[in-house]
Amino acid sequence: MNEEVNKIITLCGKDWAKIGVEFIFLGGKQECENCKIKKTCLKLKEGAKYKIVGLRDGAVQECPLHDEGVVAVEVVELPIIALVDSKIAVEGAKIHYEQRKCDVYDCSMYSLCHPIELNNGETVIVEKVIGDAPEQCRKGHSVIVAELRRAEE
């Protein structure tokens, strides 16, 4: 991933504005409705995981959600690591992510089958096939580990 091209400038809480910090954007809150700088904060994709890769020089802005205020940072969206059906996991393929119906909650691969960053039916691109699943699927599905990226809308 070319980080220079994919950098997004946004705002985050001053107390956790450090290079290397990763977070999942949960979306705006009611307090954001009338904020004059909300467009800068809310341009991230809800549910996506980001990493802070740069700090911007600038003033601390007041924010009702962050006691210390917010500052400008540069972030990149991180790839999503997930288990994908081996029949459709081809590098460069555009697929609709389908969450498996599974009740084996104690499975060590459950979070790979159900990544919190993705919604059912979301269009993604298989960036890279990483390899075999860490273990056999207890439901008998043929899956492999892949790096996914949301398709541009």
Curated annotation (Swiss-Prot):
Top-level taxon of origin: Archaea
Pfam families: UPF0179 (PF03684)
InterPro entries: UPF0179
Family per similarity comment: Belongs to the UPF0179 family.
Protein name: UPF0179 protein AF_2154
Organism: Archaeoglobus fulgidus (strain ATCC 49558 / DSM 4304 / JCM 9628 / NBRC 100126 / VC-16)
Lineage of producing organism: Archaea, Methanobacteriati, Methanobacteriota, Archaeoglobi, Archaeoglobales
